[in-house]
Amino acid sequence: MGHETMTPATTTLVFTYGTLKRGFSNHVLMQDLIRSGDASFKGVYQTLDKYPLVCGPYRVPFLLNKPGSGYHVNGELYAVSPRGLSRLDELEGISRGHYIRQPIRLAAAEEEEEEEGDLETEAPSSCVVEAYYAHKSYEEELWRRNRGRSFGAYTENEARGYVKRNDRPQHLSFLDHIRIFVSSPCD
C-alpha cells in the first residue's frame, strides 16, 4: 500500500529531545518512519524559552512544561505524517498518561552536518511545533525529585545508565516506575 506524499498541510512538526534523537535507543522508530515516508528530518533546533529537561527512572528523559526554568533545550525537528504521529503518540504513552503532547516554540540551532533524511523543504528559522512533555500527574514530583536541577541536552552522559523498556521489570507499569522513582531518596 502506497503512502501519500507528506505536505505541510498533512504533517505535524515534532521536536525530539531524548531517546528519539539520532544516536539514542528509540531513534530506530524515527528511522522506520523516514524509510516509510512518514517522517523527514528538518534540522537541529533549540527551545526559544528555557525548560527543565530531567531524567526519571532508568534515565528516561522528561521535558517539564515549566517555561522560564532550566535551559534552552537542544533537540531535533521532524515533519511527521498522521500515521507517524500516531506511532510516536503510542511510544510516548499519550493515551496511558505517560506524556502529553503540547506546543513549544523553537529556533534553529547552528547548522549541523546532515546524517539522514533530506530537507525536502526549507526548515523555518523559528516555529511553534509539538513536543512531548512529562504528564501533569507527576511533573511536579519529578521536578522536586531532581531538586530543581536540569540540563540543556540529553547526551551520552545523561543517558548513561538508560535501561530500555524491554529490560525494565515487566510486572510494573511505566507510571509505577515513576511513582517509585519520585518517592525514593535523591542521590
UniProtKB/Swiss-Prot annotation:
Residues spanning the membrane: none
Catalytic-site annotation from UniProt: 92
Gene3D superfamilies: Gamma-glutamyl cyclotransferase-like (3.10.490.10)
Enzymatic class: transferase
Matches recorded under CDD domains: GGCT_like
Protein purpose: Putative gamma-glutamylcyclotransferase.
Protein name: Putative gamma-glutamylcyclotransferase At3g02910
Organism: Arabidopsis thaliana (Mouse-ear cress)
